[in-house]
Amino acid sequence: MSTTNGHAAHTNGGPARQQEKVRVAIVGVGNCASAFVQGIHYYRDADPEQQVPGLMHVDLGGYHVRDIEFTAAFDIDVEKVGKDLGQAIWSGQNNTIRFAEVPEHLGITVHRGMTHDGLGKYLSQRITKAPGETADIVGILRDTHTDVVVSYLPVGSEQATKWYVEQILEAGCGFVNCITVFIAREDYWNKRFKKAGLPIVGDDIKSQVGATIVHRTLARLFYDRGVELERTSQLNVGGNMDFFNMLERERLESKKISKTNAVTSIVGHAMEADDVHVGPSDYVPWLTDRKWAHIRLEGQAFGDVPLNLELKLEVWDSPNSAGIVIDAVRCCKLALNHGVAGQLDGPSSYLMKSPYKQRPDDIARADTERFIERYSARTARAKTAAAKGPAAKALASGKAPGVRADGAKGRAKGKK
């Protein structure tokens, strides 16, 4: 297969995209990036036939977890810029749990990114901006043959996000938008990505079992069981830089919209703004990267009798979303392979809080599974092999000795 990433200036998909790896660049090397990188190493030898917590599939559409390769990373923190990615994920204010051993030298140097509004009033108290000029983002993405760019910029980085999106479009990469700046759900940007022949999965990454997905599920349960939801709240506290940054309430507008819509879109009736409160509450340093979510729902049941529900959820915040990102970048890669452009309807609805189209999670998952099956790299290889004869067909199906169904050589399961 070709090693080009098929930049939009040359091709918008098809055979040029169908190499064996998913080449990923990261914008923002914080706790979420750390969990993402750790997750690739933790599950690199996972059995494709086994279910892994937090992943739709170990092998998604022909791409194993280990098929994700990091090509570039960008940050503005003086404690991270210039370091190898394998060191930067443990540097600065990063404080997530260490659940996997990551080599110190991954061969990826963290480049100086663009600041714009990425460093807010509170973050600037803890993070010192690296000196020097912004790196040539477009040139780096092209030179490294990057397929997909993942954004982990801080909440409230409106200008910075849109600046990076312009670089991504010019470089010809797919985009996974993990933050609450609205790109995929906006017609303007959706049209821009379609015109460029590039896919986007967004906006605002869900967690495996996070406050929003739990809140959505409970709100949907009330609806399905005929309980009228009258009031609801979600209060979150944590000890990472995300929560510290969100002490600056002016940066929270899109975050509150994203989390609120994710819940209210599922209840089946309109709710007054004063009856719904969803958002971050406070920063508690000793929680580190842990997050506590306090959720309450108040409703009316049979006979107009009150029915109230309250729970507390405790999670490690960043690993909770890492598996979702692993699925998102692989879906984005499948779209690149086949020239599917614009926001990806199923994957965005299932994996993100603020997609272009909201829908119940079970429907969104089914749509995503259909997307994976339709654009599977295995399916494409099988069709090619069928045209070439029985031997090639056996190779593509994984029936040839020592070959997996995704066409790669078999490998014994090793240490996670």
Region annotations inferred by a language model:
Residues 2-166, 252-257, 293, 302:
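N-terminal glycine-/serine-/threonine-rich beta1-alpha1-beta2 phosphate-ribose binding loop
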Residues 27, 66, 80, 91-94, ...:
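Active-site-lining helix/loop region of Rossmann-like oxidoreductase modules
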Residues 28-34, 153-159, 179-185, 206-212, ...:
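Gly/Ser/Thr-rich loops at beta-strand to alpha-helix junctions
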Residues 57, 293-399, 404, 409-416:
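C-terminal active-site/capping subdomain that shapes the small-molecule cofactor and substrate pocket
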Residues 149-151, 175-178, 201-204, 232:
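Short catalytic-loop micro-motif centered on adjacent basic/acidic residues
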Residues 155-167, 179-199:
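Rossmann-fold NAD(P)-binding glycine/threonine-rich loop
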Residues 192-205, 226, 230:
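Rossmann-fold dehydrogenase core element
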